[in-house]
Amino acid sequence: MREYLFSESQKKGAVMRVLIFDTETSGLPVWSSPSDDPMQPHIAQFTAVIFDDASGEEEEYVDLIVRQEWPVAPEAFGVHGITPERSIEEGVPEDHAVMFFEAMSAAADRIAGFSLSFDMRIIRIARLRAGRAKGLLDAEAAVQKAKQFDVMQKCTALCKIPPTEKMMATGRKTWKQPTLVEAVRALFGEEMADAHDARGDVLATKRIYMHLKGLGLA
């Protein structure tokens, strides 16, 4: 794995850098439990890209399969399809994903994702598991919040997906927040061939981000 370092000149350049990242996991987070609960899921795949906000030119890219040394929920495997064999053959320790996220987020001016709160929670779980201090993460989260941009929330009004019956039953008549597949279909009239692969999700999210940028919404 290539060592990932940013020089001070890169960090201080005039270019606005955007980090988009995505995780596939061993299961869903237990939202009602603390992030350091041992029952919280692990990262199965971590993909991230840093690019120039103006041109979209990619500066850094990483795609990691994480070695699964813990049970994987059947429903999670059904989503991302990362087999135990592939995990063992290609996988790296989970803290590698943590280190890449920390380096890339420090170098970025904006952190973006599709349903960003999910992936930020997964990263927090992994960072605590890797021994990062909770107090430090809490302080950092307060700073990072200003840098965060949720592509899903920003494109909801553009996608114009009607509310579901469940939403209507509870009096919610706003547009439904799209899945990434639905957003690509609504905005570009295309079907995603590689949905729920972190690499495919990152590239699709970047495409939507640049579309929003062109409309003055990002």
PLM segments and residue spans:
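Metal-dependent phosphoesterase core characteristic of DEDDh/y 3'-5' exonuclease domains
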Residues: 4, 9, 17, 39-84, ...
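Short loop/turn and capping residues at structural boundaries
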Residues: 31, 88, 195-196
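Glycine-rich, highly charged phosphate/nucleotide-binding loops
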Residues: 89-98
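N-terminal accessory regions of nucleic-acid-interacting proteins
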Residues: 1-23, 27-33
